[in-house]
Each structure stands twice: as structure tokens, then as C-alpha cells.
């Protein structure tokens, strides 16, 4: 527990020190998101990576039933948060080649499924690193200035909500590949330093209102239960504060109206993710709302909604 608490505290100190609270009637002009598959709305679609989900049954509960590249049966937290703060029902992926300049005004997500703070994570998965996401963010601000002027760019930087959601893939996958260099404590410290550095770099670029989600209880998702069983994967992996809600949902599913917590809806739900979750798999459930997880790693649309409803107002009230 001590490692996670230190990590979370380090990140939140940076965020809150740089946040200037606005008046009660303040509006949020845009939502800008960085991170991994939890927030990816399609940035991986045109990448040379196996971590894609722009095919059925992904998106079966999305408006129109379309598979858009979201790692869930429906909308993901970036969409739900954008709607909750009054911007739009969906948040566009920055890498969408069909985006028009006006589509940028209410925000975008740079998140890329499979990435993390550790540069090796993105390299292994052939996805967009969080550090490259910062480069794309600079490009985004340049586009805003070019099409809508300096004042609009200033408004977005000063008053938008910036959200960073990463580290789950570092903990679930890359840590084991880095075991020759790090033990659990030193790897946690490396990720903590990386998280703080990322937030500081984002603030240097002008962001003022930054929220940071810590890692999900990775050892409790179906894939990790299946692969690692009862091996010792506690410590940094299990109990990070921001996802207390998800951990409680996994431990007490009926409390939140769920029936299944130990496997995903897609396929048999234990080792079913990306291309293994496909329309040929005859075992996909008919009622994803009964499941906390959609596939073996990602929560269902309904689970995401519970998390957003439980956390967003509490944390937004600190800076707005």
C-alpha cells in the first residue's frame, strides 16, 4: 500500500498546486485526454498494431452499434465525461483522419490503447506513447491558433479539463519485461517519477486544470487472474486510490447491480481481448450490462458509467 499512496500523493500535489479554482458558473470549453485504452476512442485504428478493436462485437452497445475503435461494448470514460460536463456525447480521437477544424474545439483524446508511462510499453505494443501524445497536443494547439486565434487557444489551455489516464499497461505487462532492471519498488518509483514529469510537461505547455487517474486494480481484471492466478502481484498493482470504486465493484458486484465480475462478456471472457474478441466467437453474452467487464481487460459501458458517476463530481469540484 505504501508505494501506491506515495505515487498518488506525488501526482496530486503537482495537479492541485497548479489548479486555479473557477467560479461556480464557469463553463469548461474542452476536454483534453491523454492515456491508454480506457480513454482511446479510435486512435489505434490506423496504427500497425494488434491492439485494435474497430470490429464487432466491440461497439455493439454504441449508438448505431458501430465498432469505432473504443475498447468496450459502448462509450468509454472520455465520452461519458465529455457528456457529463456538457460538451458532447462523444469525444473524437485526434488521429481520426476525417476530423474538421471545428471538431477540435470541444476537445479530443490522444489516448492510445496499450500505452503507458514507460516508453518500452508503447514500443512493445506499437502504439502511441504518452510522450508522443504530448507532441500531438502541441500540434493540436497550433491548429487551434491557426484556425481560431490565440485567444481561443489561451481559453482552452486555461479553462479546459485535462485528464491523464495511464500506467495500467506498464504494471500489467512491461514490469515483467523490466524485471532484470527493476524490482517492484524501484519500478513503482520510476513510474511515479514519469507520471509527475508528464504532468509537469503538460503544465509547461499551458494546461491549468489537470486530473490524473492512477492504475486500475490490474491484478483483479479477468486476464490477470487467468494468466497469473495466485502469484504475488500485489503492492503497486492492486490498490491505487483513484480506482477504489472499480475495486469495490469487483469485490461486491451485486451492490452495483452487476451479476458477473470474474470474467468479461465477450467470448469466454478470460483471455479475450482485441482480435480474440470477435464476431466469430459464439460465447459472447447477450446482456453486457450484467458484466463489470466487456472483454478480459476493459470494463463494460455500464461499469464505466458507474465509475464516472462516482468520481467525476468529487474531483471536478476541486478545480471548478
UniProtKB/Swiss-Prot annotation:
Stated EC number for the protein is 3.1.1.-
* Known glycosylation sites: 25, 287
GO cellular component, alphabetical, reads: extracellular region
Enumerate the GO terms in the molecular function aspect: lipase activity
Broad enzyme group: hydrolase
Sorted keywords for this record are:
Glycoprotein, Hydrolase, Lipid degradation, Lipid metabolism, Secreted, Signal
Q: Which residues form the signal peptide?
A: 1-19
Q: Which domain of life is it from?
A: Eukaryota
An annotated GO BP? lipid catabolic process
Classification via InterPro entries: GDSL, GDSL_lipolytic_enzyme, Lipase_GDSL_AS, SGNH_hydro_sf, SGNH_plant_lipase-like
Transmembrane residue ranges: none
The main location class comes to secreted
A Pfam family in this protein?
Lipase_GDSL
Positions annotated as active site in the UniProt record? 37, 295, 298
Q: Where would you find this protein in the cell? A: Secreted
Coiled-coil region(s) at which residues? none
What family, per the record? Belongs to the 'GDSL' lipolytic enzyme family.
Name it: GDSL esterase/lipase At3g43570
Query: What is the scientific name of the source organism?
Result: Arabidopsis thaliana (Mouse-ear cress)
Amino acid at each position: 500500500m505504501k508505494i501506491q499512496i506515495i505515487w498518488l500523493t506525488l501526482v496530486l500535489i503537482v495537479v492541485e498546486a497548479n489548479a486555479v479554482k473557477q467560479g461556480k458558473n464557469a463553463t469548461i470549453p474542452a476536454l483534453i485526454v491523454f492515456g491508454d485504452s480506457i480513454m482511446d476512442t479510435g486512435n489505434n485504428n490506423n496504427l500497425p498494431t494488434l491492439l485494435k478493436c474497430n470490429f464487432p462485437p466491440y461497439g455493439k452497445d454504441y449508438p448505431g452499434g458501430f465498432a469505432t475503435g473504443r475498447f468496450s461494448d459502448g462509450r468509454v470514460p472520455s465520452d461519458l465525461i465529455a457528456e457529463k460536463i456538457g460538451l458532447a456525447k462523444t469525444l473524437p480521437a485526434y488521429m481520426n483522419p476525417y476530423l474538421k477544424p471545428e471538431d477540435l474545439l470541444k476537445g479530443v483524446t490522444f489516448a492510445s490503447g496499450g500505452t503507458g508511462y514507460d516508453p518500452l510499453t508503447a514500443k512493445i505494443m506499437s502504439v502511441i506513447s504518452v510522450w508522443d501524445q504530448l507532441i500531438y497536443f502541441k500540434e493540436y494547439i497550433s491548429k487551434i491558433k491557426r484556425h481560431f486565434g490565440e485567444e481561443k487557444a489561451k481559453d482552452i489551455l486555461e479553462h479546459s479539463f485535462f485528464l491523464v489516464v495511464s500506467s495500467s499497461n506498464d504494471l500489467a505487462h512491461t514490469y515483467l519485461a523490466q524485471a532484470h532492471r527493476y524490482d517492484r519498488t524501484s519500478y513503482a518509483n520510476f513510474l511515479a517519477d514519469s507520471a509527475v514529469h508528464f504532468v509537469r510537461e503538460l503544465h509547461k505547455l499551458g494546461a491549468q486544470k489537470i486530473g490524473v487517474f492512477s492504475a486500475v486494480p490490474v491484478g483483479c481484471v479477468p486476464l490477470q487472474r487467468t494468466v497469473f492466478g495466485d502469484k504475488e502481484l500485489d503492492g503497486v498493482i492492486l490498490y491505487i486510490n483513484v480506482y477504489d470504486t472499480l475495486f469495490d465493484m469487483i469485490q461486491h458486484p451485486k451492490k452495483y447491480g452487476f451479476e458477473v465480475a470474474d470474467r468479461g462478456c465477450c467470448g469466454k471472457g478470460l483471455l479475450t481481448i482485441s482480435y480474440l474478441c470477435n464476431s466469430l466467437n459464439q460465447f459472447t453474452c447477450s446482456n453486457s450490462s450484467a458484466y463489470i467487464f466487456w472483454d478480459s481487460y476493459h470494463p463494460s459501458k455500464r461499469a464505466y458509467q458507474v465509475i464516472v458517476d462516482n468520481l467525476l463530481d468529487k474531483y471536478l469540484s476541486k478545480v471548478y
